[in-house]
């Protein structure tokens, strides 16, 4: 154990034999109690300080004075939502916003005594008057503040529209939109209950995952788990299930299919999560959509498996259940995700010979109809408009029958004949109402240019895998059109970006790079 900081709890309170300010000492003992006996919580929030010190003229001044005392006593206290951070590197400008926590190594330095004898937990509780903790939100009085819900709703809308980070106005350099990440963090600072803190943490974790920052996503999910443990059996199950779903998504994003499947299987088989998966339509959508992707991975990657066709069939069954749940909750955004996945899976399974009596060309009409349905839903879902995945999938399927081999000559490459956007009209005889889903472009290169321009101008933000997909399609259609300069630049960018992909995804793109003529490679 490190050098001990001795705290005498009886009046006059003292630290290492010297008189100590009561408020500063109270906060340190409260943090010590949280670290020692409240492992599921660990943090002390501003709401508790306001409840305990109602006559404090300025909470900011109180906190500043307390941290000066902590420094004088040789104790480092942390602040912010990430209790795993090193307090030495935290930004002091955000300190007054809390919450506060005591690292385990710092807690080991402290010894609390009562009249010189070691203090028990009951002694600590009596000193802290812990019964004066804030009333739970469920029993809070009126008026109920709207601040949290206003910030949270805006952050949710930004998340749905793909506005993950702050965007700048075209003039005057002012923020046009704080973005979903900042919005959920702001909402967390305004939260007045465990459930609100948990909702904000869930939203933040979703943003980090979509930003491809899986480490930050996992840290935020760890914070969410602590909040859920504190809530105990009162939590209805949705947040706990979503924490598991996001944890599984983080594993899938790194193509750890075995871990993803294990997490999902545990949710399905073990109560109380099994009941949430069964009866909560949003969780049922998330679970089946991700499990469908897992089974799709088995069907496409386990080439020596005798049950590939069964895995493909199971994947489609899970997609069907996910689509049922998406429409049950009335979410066009959820439904368009499933429709896009079904369209691509339909074509991929047929391409691999996993659909009896159907090859890639035979499956193409139905695959395209699913993708156009997805785009129609996307344009009506209140999100940011055209789906990048739908565009990438359409362009890939349109050239799917083209195969000039590795390192083809430029004339041979350009002689290939991909399906053109205008050719899709023949697939829509029974779906005239869904023509809006067709991209309003005359050729695929224009669509690829539009996607890249939206990314470069900050109008859309794509994941790393989406960026690589866009670059590949742009390079293919630019080469086909004879625009070798833009094609070469896209291939160079693609070659650099694939370094951040999981090995299986990287291998796919490396194989595709070898299928371009030397003039652009």
Annotate each predicted stretch with a short phrase.
Residues 150, 157, 176, 192-193, ...:
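Short coil/turn linker motifs that delimit alpha-helical repeat modules in TPR/alpha-solenoid proteins
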Residues 1-182:
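Intrinsically disordered, low-complexity protein-interaction/activation regions
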Residues 1-9, 16, 20-22, 56, ...:
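C-terminal non-catalytic interaction modules
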Residues 155-173, 199-213, 239-256, 283-304, ...:
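Tandem amphipathic alpha-helical repeat scaffolds
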Residues 319-323, 327-458, 467:
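Eukaryotic tandem repeat interaction scaffolds
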Residues 144-148, 184-197, 226-238, 269-284, ...:
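Flexible helix-coil transition and linker loops at the boundaries of alpha-helical arrays
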Residues 129-139, 166-185, 209-228, 254-274, ...:
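Helix-turn-helix repeat elements of alpha-solenoid scaffolds
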């Amino acid at each position: 154990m490190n050098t001990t900081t001795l705290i005498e709890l009886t009046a006059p309170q003292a630290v290492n034999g010297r008189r100590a300010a009561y408020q500063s000492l109270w906060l340190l003992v409260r943090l010590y109690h949280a670290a020692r006996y409240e492992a599921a919580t660990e943090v002390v929030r501003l709401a508790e300080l306001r409840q305990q010190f109602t006559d404090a003229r300025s909470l900011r001044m109180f906190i500043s004075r307390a941290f000066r005392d902590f420094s004088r006593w040789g104790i480092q206290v942390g602040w912010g939502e990430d209790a795993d951070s090193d307090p030495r590197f935290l930004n002091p400008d955000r300190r007054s916003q809390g919450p506060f926590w005591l690292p385990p190594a710092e807690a080991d330095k402290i010894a609390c005594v009562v009249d010189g004898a070691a203090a028990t937990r009951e002694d600590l509780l009596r000193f802290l008057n812990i019964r004066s903790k804030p009333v739970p939100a469920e029993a809070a009085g009126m008026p109920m503040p709207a601040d949290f819900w206003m910030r949270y709703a805006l952050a949710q809308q930004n998340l749905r529209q793909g506005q993950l980070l702050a965007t700048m106005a075209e003039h005057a350099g002012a923020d046009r939109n704080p973005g979903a990440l900042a919005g959920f963090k702001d909402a967390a600072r305004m939260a007045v209950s465990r459930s609100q803190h948990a909702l904000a943490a869930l939203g933040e974790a979703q943003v980090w995952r979509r930003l491809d920052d899986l480490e930050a996503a996992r840290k935020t999910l760890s914070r969410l788990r602590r909040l859920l443990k504190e809530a105990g059996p009162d939590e209805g199950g949705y947040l706990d299930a979503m924490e598991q779903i996001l944890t599984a998504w983080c594993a899938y994003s790194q193509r750890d299919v075995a871990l993803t499947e294990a997490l999902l299987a545990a949710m399905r088989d073990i109560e109380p999560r099994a009941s949430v998966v069964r009866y909560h339509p949003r969780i049922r959508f998330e679970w089946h959509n991700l499990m469908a992707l897992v089974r799709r991975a088995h069907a496409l990657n386990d080439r020596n498996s005798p049950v590939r066709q069964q895995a493909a069939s199971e994947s489609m069954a899970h997609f069907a259940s996910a689509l049922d749940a998406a429409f049950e909750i009335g979410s066009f955004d959820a439904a368009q995700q499933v429709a896009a996945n079904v369209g691509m899976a339909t074509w991929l399974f047929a391409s691999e010979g996993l659909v009896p009596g159907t090859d890639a060309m035979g499956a193409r009409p139905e695959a395209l109809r699913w993708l156009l349905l997805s785009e129609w839903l996307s344009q009506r879902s209140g999100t940011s408009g055209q789906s990048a995945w739908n565009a990438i999938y359409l362009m890939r399927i349109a050239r799917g029958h083209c195969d000039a081999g590795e390192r083809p000559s430029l004339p041979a490459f350009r002689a290939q004949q991909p399906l053109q956007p205008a050719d899709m009209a023949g697939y829509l005889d029974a779906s005239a109402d869904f023509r809006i889903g067709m991209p309003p472009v005359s050729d695929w290169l224009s669509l690829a240019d539009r996607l890249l321009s939206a990314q470069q101008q900050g109008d859309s933000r794509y994941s790393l895998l989406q960026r690589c997909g866009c670059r590949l399609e742009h390079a293919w259609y630019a080469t086909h059109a004879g625009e070798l300069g833009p094609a070469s630049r896209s291939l160079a960018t693609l070659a650099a970006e694939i370094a951040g992909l999981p090995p299986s995804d990287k291998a796919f793109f490396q194989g595709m790079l070898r299928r371009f003529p030397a003039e652009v490679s």
